[in-house]
């Protein structure tokens, strides 16, 4: 009996020292389970006399009920404690300011394209998407760039086969639209173009916007007026603009347009010119009746100038720190 009393004391101490509900379950199994200590003690009572067996059975069963009761009480206390700790850890201070909701923003290239499109739509232009995979005829031949023309070398073309390629310029859409539409024509063609070049000012994929006007009595003065109007709107009226003669196979005369920075340095912005009579002939437009002008500009280049970006690759690296700067522009 002394050993039994000592055992009950040990069980009570174990229950009191328990810090987890799982520990209480282990105590219950250890002492009260089928293979538990008290169960084993009960089996030994068969060797006792009838009176001793009866006496000890009553004591043990009473203690078992007390142990079960104490385990349940301890479980309730631990459950309350765990809940209190959880509530404490998840408490929200309602006096603190709420978390600011982040809003998405457009990529600076998308912003620039949308700005340019909106400007030309106000002037009566229509905007149309165009295929990025082209054939040799629309990308080169119809634009007065014949098979062995040296201008092809500067395009660094990605070829799929002998006829299909990733377009090197949005000018290819000029041919398609002039074959589909009858003059007067006034369209812009924004889109991606591809050239095999990669450095701080070039990427294998970049964006262009091509503009085309076909009508009677269109001249270079009309073209200059449109370009001045656009550049003043985009960069501000204080910008200095310079036209200089250039050469493109599909326009004649041709010019490149520069803006002059605060250091007096010329920065090329776009190319333009009157559409070559051979190009009009290729789309069955009579150059004696109609004339046409065209211009093309690189979106990344003017975005770099507008936002003061020095490396074109920054547009395509998806650095959130970089992109966040343009969220509200």
Swiss-Prot record:
Q: Which InterPro entries match?
A: aa-tRNA-synth_II, aa-tRNA-synth_II/BPL/LPL, Phe-tRNA-synth_IIc_asu, Phe-tRNA_ligase_II_N, Phe_tRNA_ligase_alpha1_bac, Phenylalanyl-tRNA_Synthase, tRNA-bd_arm
Query: Would the keyword Aminoacyl-tRNA synthetase be found if you checked this record's keyword annotation?
Result: yes
One Pfam family hit: Phe_tRNA-synt_N
Q: Write one Gene Ontology MF term.
A: magnesium ion binding
- List the residue ranges forming a coiled coil, or say none: none
A single BP term in Gene Ontology = phenylalanyl-tRNA aminoacylation
EC number assigned by the record: 6.1.1.20
Q: Where in the cell is it found?
A: Cytoplasm
Question: What PROSITE patterns does UniProt report for this protein, alphabetically?
Answer: AA_TRNA_LIGASE_II (PS50862)
Q: Say if the entry is tagged with keyword Magnesium.
A: yes
| Note on cofactor | Binds 2 magnesium ions per tetramer.
Swiss-Prot/TrEMBL cofactor(s): Mg(2+)
CDD domains noted in UniProt: PheRS_alpha_core
Q: What class of enzyme is it?
A: ligase
Q: Cite a GO CC annotation.
A: cytoplasm
This enzyme catalyses: tRNA(Phe) + L-phenylalanine + ATP = L-phenylalanyl-tRNA(Phe) + AMP + diphosphate + H(+)
Subunit structure and binding partners:
Tetramer of two alpha and two beta subunits.
| Family per similarity comment | Belongs to the class-II aminoacyl-tRNA synthetase family. Phe-tRNA synthetase alpha subunit type 1 subfamily.
The record, for HAMAP family, names:
Phe_tRNA_synth_alpha1 (MF_00281)
Its name, as the record gives it, is Phenylalanine--tRNA ligase alpha subunit
Species annotation:
Buchnera aphidicola subsp. Acyrthosiphon pisum (strain APS) (Acyrthosiphon pisum symbiotic bacterium)
Taxonomic placement? Bacteria, Pseudomonadati, Pseudomonadota, Gammaproteobacteria, Enterobacterales
């Amino acid at each position: 009996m002394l050993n039994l009393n000592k055992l009950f004391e040990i069980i009570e101490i174990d229950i009191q020292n328990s810090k987890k509900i799982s520990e209480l379950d282990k105590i219950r199994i250890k002492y009260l389970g089928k293979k538990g200590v008290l169960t084993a003690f009960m089996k030994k009572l068969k060797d006792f006399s009838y009176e001793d067996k009866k006496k000890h059975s009553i004591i043990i069963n009473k203690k078992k009920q007390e142990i079960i009761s104490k385990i349940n009480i301890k479980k309730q206390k631990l459950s309350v404690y765990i809940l209190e700790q959880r509530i404490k850890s998840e408490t929200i201070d309602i006096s603190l300011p709420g978390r600011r909701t982040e809003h998405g923003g457009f990529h600076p290239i998308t912003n620039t394209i949308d700005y340019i499109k909106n400007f030309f739509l106000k002037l009566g232009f229509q905007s149309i998407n165009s295929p990025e995979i082209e054939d040799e005829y629309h990308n080169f031949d119809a634009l007065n760039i014949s098979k062995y023309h040296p201008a092809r070398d500067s395009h660094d073309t990605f070829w799929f086969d002998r006829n299909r390629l990733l377009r090197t310029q949005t000018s290819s859409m000029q041919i398609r639209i002039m074959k589909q539409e009858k003059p007067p024509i006034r369209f812009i063609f924004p889109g991606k173009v591809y050239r095999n070049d990669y450095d701080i000012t070039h990427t294998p994929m970049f964006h262009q916007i091509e503009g085309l006007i076909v009508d009677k009595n269109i001249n270079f003065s009309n073209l200059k007026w449109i370009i001045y109007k656009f550049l003043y709107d985009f960069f501000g009226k204080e910008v200095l603009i310079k036209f200089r003669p250039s050469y493109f196979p599909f326009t004649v005369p041709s010019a490149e347009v520069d803006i002059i920075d605060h250091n007096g340095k010329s920065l090329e912005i776009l190319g333009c010119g009157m559409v070559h009579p051979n190009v009009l002939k290729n789309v069955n437009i009579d150059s004696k009746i109609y004339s046409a002008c065209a211009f093309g500009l690189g979106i990344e280049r003017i975005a770099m100038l507008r936002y003061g970006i020095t490396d074109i690759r920054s547009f395509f690296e998806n650095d959130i720190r970089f992109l966040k700067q343009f969220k509200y522009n």
